[in-house]
């Protein structure tokens, strides 16, 4: 974009520009509402809530990926503490609907209502995205797996069968959400219809309507409205290739109130090659030039530039690196890319993900394994990583930068800068004249150190800044936002080359926090005051003060930590380096999401500050501490005592409204050793004398499939979903008669999704496995009977155990799972007498509704409940107390189980993860070369919290949260180990403490209701 002529012609006075700009824009951009309420409005610039403009900075988490309702508060408090104004969630139709006509919004984490009440209590706006399709790398994209049979049509269209199937969920979830809308004194501000569904047009250029897609979207909107949803309806387009659902483009059926677009400029997966068709060649930090400005100008010119999903990280696919791919998605990514969005005048952002969580059970799509850490700012084990803090220094700023919610982009050029390697975008509020200059490398992959000055336009004329001090520095993959005419309380910052972090008005005086990395220079000018002094006694100041007639300029070289400058009128300027800014908290004394600067205390030092409350003269703070920490608190002078996590602290100093104290100590916790393992066979089904007559078994009798990919006609339908079986490991048991000229082989064609595998037995003899790969979804293979003994006088029994990785996303949700073709091969003509399939306990009528419907598969150990607390493991064999390994001799499946007590002291947040390893004589190469060919499942108190495929997926650490773990009681740990080789398998299981924090959060909550135990009915599924 060309730089504004106003700037090029000498940077004319801001005052004259402001008047013209305001006049033009007041007539150009209409203010919209949805015709039902004006509580939430919007225009070209931003959203308005209750008449006040907001820069909406949000982030996503999924309650169904952390199935402990008590921990949702922990996450929301961490989101609030960082300065986010909002958060977003997907709901999950499949999680709430185990079978047609059945909905569960009550059991355990299925009851998500507390999230909405917490949003109100804590003070966060909420964007809710109920689907019915959500993608999210969830199994079938969040659709119920009973819809994947083909019986409901192609899905996500106006097929009456599909609409009838989704209506109970859609109507009920709308009713549940409606009382929590902002129109009903709740905090839900936006309601999303569908997800990344760019299906309004058959032809984008001619706007030939896609009637099916339009009617589908309109149906969802109508049902939502009929059931109480009167908040604005939104939609997120998947990329900038489509132009659907915008009222600015057409009045076509299905339009939503506000349209947005999702963006993953690096890649949505750690395997960046998968994004080449959308993003082009991957070059780290290059994709900053997405044409958001021109795209929004075409798509939604009278609506805010809105990104319902912007890259908060990437998922780790099967075969991806251990621990994910945080390197190119770390603090530098957050610093550079999120400021770049601001430079493009985006005023509503939601990071995907802010907390990723865990694909426990079979929640994952076929693309990913157990971890959904996503390299998010809040890690899978709930730890705040450096990326969180680097994001926080921006979200704290956008929350108090009220003028940022209405800006025009006047230019973007290297001509603002004295250094041609540095580009600057100018944003200016047309009403107030406040401006924001976003600086970054002209060639964004560059990580060089660049120094420069910037030409700015201020209310006091054109300036080149800094005026006195050393030049501004960009060091590496960094961006800086330089403000001019920035309001903080009643004061105005004429300019600052140090970034604004936050401010508060305390006792009628402003406290402004600025930050710049250690060793770099900063300079600021405050209007309306003409003197300043360095207020840190005992510390050497590297600071210059330049008084003016009606302002004062301070130039400084940033030292390590925090310093304080006092202006002549009592205004205080806090100078912070990056590390100090990371732990500098702006904590409101109320729960108003819009609170910006008033009713706030500032706290420097702790790992986390969750809340602040002023009761009389007692200041009560809550939060978390990693170790002994020096803390400074900017609070009213009336404060007479400070309580931290309910305990009165010893105040070292309380001068000038700054209270200093020391908090915490070195908290420690040691885990007991995991021992006392017992073991039993978990594949009795291969034995010839096994009777497949329990309630676990269904006889395959269906001859015609509803799936668009029909199976071979020589057998009944063997797709698991058409037999009411949906997730996990599946067991087929087929019989065929003995003959004089018996078959010599069996041909199998099986589809199970990426990373799936299967093993085959004949008459108890192992005849082979398909080990699987990270990318292969289907395999056909012929297995010889040469290693098995065929029966001469009775039926032969063929057993196939398959690992159903998951259902695919989008249109691929209909891809079948199970056996497409099973054919006996030999000199004669053969057919199977009967096929049976083992289902999970209860099939679609789950015996364990708290953990259902995506937790359990069909292994014997799961069906009878060996993985559950309270199971009497009478058939078990003791594992040697000297053994550090769990072993399976030969090919087969065994279950290992033990019970380990925990006793975590009150006041500690102890994060625990399990580590599974499988020794081999090679590293991660190929399945064939890996000598420990196994698949294992980790169960903790009944929850499947780890899928371990060492030769395919490289995840070895599996965090398990409190609530799933009993922190003050016995914990049932079970591991099923499936050896896919005659050589047998060996696995090692251990656990580790990831971190220990002193916390105000009650981790000793009663989570027993989340861990229901074994019931007698399980025996019926043996």
UniProtKB/Swiss-Prot annotation:
Give GO terms: molecular function aspect only. Answer: beta-galactosidase activity
UniProt signal peptide: 1-22
| Compartment list | Secreted
**Residue positions binding substrate:** 90, 135-137, 195, 264, 374
Task: Name the cystine pairs.
Answer: 270-325
Keywords of this entry: Carbohydrate metabolism, Disulfide bond, Glycoprotein, Glycosidase, Hydrolase, Polysaccharide degradation, Secreted, Signal
Decide whether keyword Signal is in the record.
yes
Give the enzyme's main class according to its UniProt record, as a single word. hydrolase
Its UniProt entry gives the catalysed reaction(s) as: Hydrolysis of terminal non-reducing beta-D-galactose residues in beta-D-galactosides
Please identify the protein, giving its name as recorded.
Probable beta-galactosidase B
């Amino acid at each position: 974009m060309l730089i504004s002529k106003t700037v090029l012609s000498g940077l004319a006075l801001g005052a004259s520009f402001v008047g013209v700009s305001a006049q033009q824009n007041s007539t150009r951009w209409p203010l919209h509402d949805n015709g039902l309420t004006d509580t939430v409005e919007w225009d070209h610039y931003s959203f308005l809530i209750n008449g006040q403009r907001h820069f909406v900075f949000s982030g996503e988490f999924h309650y169904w990926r952390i199935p402990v309702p008590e921990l949702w508060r922990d996450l929301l408090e961490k989101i609030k503490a960082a300065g986010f104004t909002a958060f977003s969630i997907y709901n999950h139709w499949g999680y709430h609907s185990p079978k047609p006509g059945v909905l569960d919004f009550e059991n355990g984490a299925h009851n998500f209502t507390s999230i909405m009440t917490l949003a109100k209590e804590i003070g966060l706006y909420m964007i809710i995205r109920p689907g019915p399709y959500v993608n999210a790398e969830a199994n079938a994209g969040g659709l119920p797996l009973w819809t994947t049979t083909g019986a409901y049509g192609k899905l996500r269209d106006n097929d009456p069968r599909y609409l009838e199937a989704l209506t109970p969920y859609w109507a009920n979830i709308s009713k549940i959400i409606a009382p929590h809308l902002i129109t009903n004194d709740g905090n839900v501000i936006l309601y999303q219809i569908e997800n990344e569904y760019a299906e309004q047009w058959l032809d984008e250029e001619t706007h030939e309507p896609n009637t099916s897609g339009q009617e589908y979207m309109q149906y969802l909107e109508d049902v939502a409205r009929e059931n109480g949803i009167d908040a604005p309806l939104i939609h997120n387009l998947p990329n900038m290739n489509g132009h659907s659902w915008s009222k600015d483009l057409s009045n076509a059926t299905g339009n939503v109130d506000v349209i947005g677009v999702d963006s993953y400029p690096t890649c949505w997966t750690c395997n960046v090659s998968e994004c080449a068709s959308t993003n082009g060649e991957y070059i780290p930090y290059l994709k900053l030039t997405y044409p958001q400005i021109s795209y929004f100008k075409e798509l939604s010119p009278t609506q805010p530039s809105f990104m319902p999903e912007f890259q908060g990280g990437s998922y780790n696919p099967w075969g991806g690196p251990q621990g994910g791919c945080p390197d190119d998605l770390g603090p530098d990514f957050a610093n550079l890319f999120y400021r770049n969005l601001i430079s493009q005048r985006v005023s509503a952002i939601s990071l995907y993900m802010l907390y990723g969580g865990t694909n426990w059970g079979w929640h994952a799509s076929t693309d990913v394994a157990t971890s959904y850490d996503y390299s998010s700012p809040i890690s899978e084990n709930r730890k705040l990583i450096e990326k969180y803090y680097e994001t926080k220094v921006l979200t704290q700023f956008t929350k108090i930068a009220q003028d940022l919610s209405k800006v025009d982009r006047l230019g973007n050029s290297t001509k603002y800068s004295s250094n041609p390697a540095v580009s600057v975008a100018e944003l200016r509020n047309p009403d107030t004249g406040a401006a924001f200059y976003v600086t970054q490398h002209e060639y964004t992959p560059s990580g060089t150190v660049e120094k420069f000055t910037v030409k700015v336009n201020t209310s006091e004329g054109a300036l080149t800044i800094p005026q006195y001090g050393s030049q501004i520095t960009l060091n590496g993959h960094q961006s800086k936002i330089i403000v001019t005419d920035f309001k903080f309380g009643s004061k105005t910052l004429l300019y600052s080359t140090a970034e604004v972090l936050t401010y508060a008005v305390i006792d009628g005086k402003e406290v402004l926090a600025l930050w710049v990395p250690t060793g770099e220079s900063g300079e600021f000018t405050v209007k309306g005051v003409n003197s300043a002094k360095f207020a840190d006694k005992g510390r050497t100041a590297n600071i210059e003060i330049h008084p003016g007639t009606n302002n004062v300029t301070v130039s400084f070289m940033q030292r390590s930590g925090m310093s304080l400058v006092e202006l002549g009128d009592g205004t205080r300027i806090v100078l912070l380096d990056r590390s100090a800014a990371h732990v500098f908290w702006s904590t409101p004394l109320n729960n108003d999401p819009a609170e910006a600067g008033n009713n706030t205390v500032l706290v420097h030092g702790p790992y986390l500050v969750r809340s602040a409350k002023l009761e009389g003269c007692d200041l009560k703070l809550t939060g978390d501490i990693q170790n002994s920490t020096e803390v400074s608190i900017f609070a009213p002078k009336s404060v007479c005592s400070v309580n931290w996590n309910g305990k009165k602290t010893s105040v070292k100093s309380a001068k000038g409204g700054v209270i200093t104290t020391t908090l915490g100590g070195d908290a420690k916790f040691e885990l007991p050793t995991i021992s006392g393992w017992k073991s039993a066979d978990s594949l009795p089904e291969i034995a010839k004398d096994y009777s497949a007559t329990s309630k676990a078994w269904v006889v395959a009798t269906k001859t015609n499939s509803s799936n668009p990919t029909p199976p071979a006609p020589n057998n009944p339908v063997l797709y698991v979903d058409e037999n009411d079986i949906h997730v996990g490991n599946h067991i087929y048991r087929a019989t065929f008669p003995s003959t004089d000229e018996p078959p010599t082989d069996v041909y199998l064609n099986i589809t199970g999704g990426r990373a799936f595998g299967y093993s085959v037995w004949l008459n108890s003899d192992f005849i082979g496995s398909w080990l699987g790969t990270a990318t292969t979804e289907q395999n056909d293979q012929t297995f010889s009977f040469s290693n098995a003994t065929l029966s001469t006088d009775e039926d032969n029994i063929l057993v196939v155990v398959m690992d159903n990785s998951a259902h695919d996303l989008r249109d691929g949700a209909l891809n079948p799972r199970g056996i497409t073709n099973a054919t006996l091969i030999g000199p004669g003509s053969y057919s199977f007498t009967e096929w049976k399939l083992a289902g999970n306990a209860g099939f679609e009528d789950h015996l364990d509704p708290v953990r259902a419907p995506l937790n359990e598969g069909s292994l014997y150990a799961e069906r009878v409940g060996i993985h559950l607390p309270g199971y009497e493991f009478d058939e078990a064999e003791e594992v040697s107390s000297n053994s550090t390994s769990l072993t399976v001799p030969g090919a087969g499946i065994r279950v290992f189980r033990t019970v380990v007590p925990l006793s975590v002291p009150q006041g500690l947040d102890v994060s625990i993860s399990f580590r599974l390893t499988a020794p081999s004589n090679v590293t991660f190469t190929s399945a064939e070369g890996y000598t420990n060919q196994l698949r294992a499942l980790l169960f903790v108190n009944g929850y499947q919290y780890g899928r371990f495929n060492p030769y395919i997926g490289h995840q070895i650490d599996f965090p398990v949260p409190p609530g799933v773990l009993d922190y003050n009681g016995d914990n049932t740990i079970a591991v099923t180990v499936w050896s896919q080789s005659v050589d047998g398998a060996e696995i090692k299981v251990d656990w580790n403490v990831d971190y220990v924090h002193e916390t105000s959060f009650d981790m000793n909550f009663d989570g027993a209701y989340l861990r229901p135990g074994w019931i007698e009915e399980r025996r019926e599924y043996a």
